[in-house]
Amino acid sequence: LKNRNFDAYYCSTKDQALEQAIKLIPEGNSVSWGGSMTIKHMGLIEALYQGNYEIIDRDKGQTPQEKKELAQKAFFADTYLSSTNALSEDGQLVNIDGYGNRVAAMSFGPENVIIIVGVNKIVKSWEDGIRRARHTAAPLNVQRFPGKKTPCMTTGTCENCTSNDCICSYIVITRMCNIPKRIKVIIV
């Protein structure tokens, strides 16, 4: 990761990862995040609400339009948090996204991007990362959206669909952090 200009950290527990993530977010920052069970389960969102941050939370939108506006506003946050669908052993991030808001923010958005990655997401190559993203992550992620009617919702595996409900519209491989240390990766 460091050879690819990412800032990298390893934490052996989720509590250590939570502590490290909070250290990387300056007080007073506007902060938002992409859909991530990793971030939610480690307690990071809850910790942010207890801290001195301006929170941009698309889930607080009451209507589809409000949710969309909050997702767009997240692109301009000071700090953006996410996980990744896969991390190759040579340090490349692999992500699949439905609307593109998460991968857009990671690629060219906030000045401070923090990615939390479980060791279960580490794969040999970026090609293996795409396989993991399509055949493991996407079928699990679509379960969070009960209204989606995709083949993987039923079969549990990617069917390479072109459904209007598809959550795999964008596949992005981040091979380098163009601005050194803009993207911080915490492996837990």
Residue ranges and their predicted role:
Residues 1-71, 75-81:
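N-terminal active-site beta-alpha-beta segment that forms phosphate/nucleotide-binding
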Residues 75-188:
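Conserved phosphate- and dinucleotide-binding cores of soluble alpha/beta proteins
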